[in-house]
Swiss-Prot record:
This is Ribonuclease Y. GO terms for biological process: mRNA catabolic process. Its EC number is 3.1.-.-. It is found in: Cell membrane. The lineage of its organism: Bacteria, Bacillati, Bacillota, Clostridia, Thermoanaerobacterales. It comes from Thermoanaerobacter pseudethanolicus (strain ATCC 33223 / 39E). Keywords: Cell membrane, Endonuclease, Hydrolase, Membrane, Nuclease, RNA-binding, Transmembrane, Transmembrane helix.
Length: 508
């Protein structure tokens, strides 16, 4: 039974093995057939692709050959055309060369004929000269000299007449043009002018205020006059006091300080000192504002701040009674208008016109003429050479070298010479007072000085650490002697030298 089972199992295994082998062989054969089919298909596709590529290559070769043949034909045609044109040019050149040869031969023949004619003319000319010399009894050189002399005289006379006519015409035209330019400039520049005075009037709320201004034993009025350098005139005029002084800046400081004191009501030396300092600062602001407004009115930009301050100070300076700042603005406008008419640099003319008297803002502090001082200030604050030259030339201290310098000079003369612009008497008076202060300030140890009482007195403040009580008598005598030598004045001048020592301490 067991053996039968084993045999059955063995037979089963054998049958299974044979079945698997048959199946495997069948799959292998199928795979081989498939591979063979794929390989044959690939060979057929490759052959087809090869034939297609060969056909395309043949077509491309044929196309390229056709294009090349066409290009060769075109090139040959172009070469043939060029050859034809070259042949035509050669023929043309040959014809021209032949024509030139003919012309050259013709010119040579004509040249020979001309030479023969020139020789004949030369012979005839020589014969004529010899005949003229024989008839006139003059040589050729002598006759030539006489002829040239006569011609020269005629030409010189005609030239002299012509030059004279041209000069007269030019002068007439220049004079007419100058009148027209100056007339237009004056018409377009309307400047107001008010005569400058040396007094200011301060209105009081009542006459009792006069006593408070004078103070106990006159200490308040003395303090005001000492600190400001002016004369305070208190008379019978109702509800008014008069501030007198030749320096407008000091007078303005005194006026503002006095008005502030009257408004405040507290009037004593300490308060006066405080108000005077405030007034000085306020006047400094007014000076700066006046300079800025002047530059803006004229249309000048880029001025150095120090020049603007100096311009503002000109508001408080006069020249023969004419306000120097208004005069400078007027000169700037006139010079600019005339420069526009002439086609010159109007900006340079206006700038130089505005700054031409800038030296007058400091001429009482610096020695030298205001022209040179102004030129030095302009140079210091980086003004252009053209502006500096115009400032230096406006009083002919140097010869004007530019049109703008001449225009500034002319505008200055127009502004100063017009009717009502200046008054000689006031200027001479102010110069005399200024001279008194300059003499006093020239001595060592003098801190400041003030000419008051219409020039009949000069008060001098000295530095106590330099000048002692014994020296002030000698100083007063020396100043008086120098005033007698250098200043012309009516009557007498009182010289007052003040030495004051103030000690301050604080209780803590």
């Amino acid at each position: 039974m067991i053996i039968t089972a084993l045999i059955a199992i063995a037979v089963g295994f054998l049958i299974g093995y044979l079945a698997r082998k048959i199946i495997a062989e069948s799959k292998i054969k199928s795979a081989e057939n498939l591979a063979r089919t794929i390989l044959e298909s690939a060979k057929r596709d490759a052959e087809n692709k090869k034939r297609e590529l060969l056909l395309e290559a043949k077509e491309e070769i044929h196309r390229m050959r056709t294009d090349l043949e066409k290009e060769i034909r075109d090139r040959r045609g172009e070469l043939q055309r060029l050859e034809k044109r070259l042949l035509q040019k050669e023929e043309t050149l040959d014809k021209r060369a032949e024509t030139l040869e003919q012309k050259e031969s013709f010119l040579e023949e004509k040249q020979k004929e001309i030479q023969q004619l020139e020789e004949q003319i030369s012979l005839l000319y020589q014969k004529e000269i010899e005949e003229l010399e024989r008839i006139s009894g003059l040589s050729r050189e002598e006759a030539k000299a006489i002829l040239l002399e006569n011609v020269q005289k005629d030409i010189q006379h005609e030239m002299a007449v012509m030059i004279k006519e041209m000069e007269n015409k030019a002068k007439e035209e220049a004079e007419m043009k100058a009148r027209e330019i100056i007339g237009n400039a004056i018409q377009r520049c309307a400047a107001d002018h008010a005569a400058e005075t040396t007094v200011s009037v301060v209105t009081l709320p009542n006459d009792e205020m006069k006593g408070r201004i004078i103070g106990r034993e006159g200490r308040n009025i003395r303090t005001i006059e000492t600190l400001t350098g002016i004369d305070l005139i208190i008379d019978d005029t109702p509800e008014a006091v008069v501030i007198s002084g030749f320096d407008p800046i000091r007078r303005e400081v005194a006026r503002i300080a006095l008005e502030k004191l009257i408004e405040d009501g507290r009037i004593h030396p300490a308060r006066i000192e405080e108000m005077v300092e405030k007034a000085k600062k306020e006047v400094d602001n007014m000076i700066l504002k006046a300079g800025e407004e002047a530059a803006f009115e004229v249309g000048i930009h880029g001025l150095h701040p120090e020049l603007i301050k100096l311009l503002g100070r000109l508001k408080f300076r006069t020249s023969y009674g004419q306000n120097v700042l208004k005069h400078s603005i007027e000169v700037a406008h006139l010079a600019g208008l005339m420069a526009y008419e002439l086609g010159a640099d109007a900006l340079v003319a206006k700038r130089a016109g505005l700054l031409h008297d800038i030296g007058k803002a400091v001429d009482h502090e610096v020695e030298g003429p205001h022209v040179m001082i102004g030129a030095e200030l302009a140079k210091r604050y980086h003004e252009s050479d053209a502006v500096i030259h115009a400032i230096m030339a406006h009083h002919n201290d140097v010869e004007p070298q530019t049109v703008e310098a001449v225009l500034v000079q002319a505008a200055d003369a127009i502004s100063a010479a017009r009717p009502g612009a200046r008054r000689e008497a006031l200027e001479a008076y102010i110069k005399r007072l200024d001279k008194l202060e300059q003499i006093a300030n020239s001595f060592e140890g003098v801190e400041k000085s003030y000419a008051i009482q219409a020039g009949r007195e000069i008060r001098i403040m000295v530095k106590p650490e330099i000048v002692d009580d014994d020296d002030i008598v000698i100083l007063a005598r020396n100043i008086s002697k120098k005033i007698e030598e250098e200043v012309e004045y009516p009557g007498q001048i009182k010289v007052t030298v003040i030495r004051e020592t103030v000690a301050v301490d604080y209780a803590k």
